[in-house]
């Protein structure tokens, strides 16, 4: 039985943070999704097969607008200009394998 990782991340308001996928490169059939804990909202996605990278930064009243950057090689997610609205749990799903990040904003 494999338990998902839950990685605590501390960041100061106004700073940027990168949530690392720990991938060095993506494979041809990789699908990577980042979700925010409120309603399990999809905020970013890479579908290698479809050659598509998408950030959904208008969700949740636009709290992520112009703040999300997705690394096309590793799938890591950077959130810029952090506010307390970004506090909480983020789920990284790579081909159905889940890891979690808990973001603490001060």
Question: Where do the PLM segments sit?
Answer:
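N-terminal Sec-dependent signal peptide, specifically the hydrophobic helical h-region
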Residues: 1-9, 62
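Generic preference for hydrophobic/aromatic residues in regular secondary structure cores
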Residues: 2, 43-47, 68
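N-terminal V-set
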Residues: 23-63, 100
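Flexible inter-domain hinge/linker segments at boundaries of tandem extracellular adhesion modules
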Residues: 1-4, 37-39, 103-106
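Ligand-binding face of N-terminal immunoglobulin V-set domains in extracellular IgSF glycoproteins
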Residues: 16, 61-106
């Amino acid at each position: 039985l494999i338990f998902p990782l839950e990685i605590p991340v501390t960041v100061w308001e106004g700073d940027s943070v990168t949530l690392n996928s720990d991938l060095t490169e993506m494979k041809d059939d990789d699908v990577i999704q980042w979700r925010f804990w409120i309603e399990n909202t999809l905020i970013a996605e890479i579908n290698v097969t479809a050659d598509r990278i998408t950030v959904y930064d208008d969700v949740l009243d636009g709290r992520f607008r112009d703040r999300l950057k997705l690394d096309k090689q590793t799938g890591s997610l950077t959130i810029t200009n952090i506010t307390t609205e970004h506090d909480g749990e983020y789920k990284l799903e790579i081909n159905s394998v889940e890891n979690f990040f808990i973001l603490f904003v001060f």
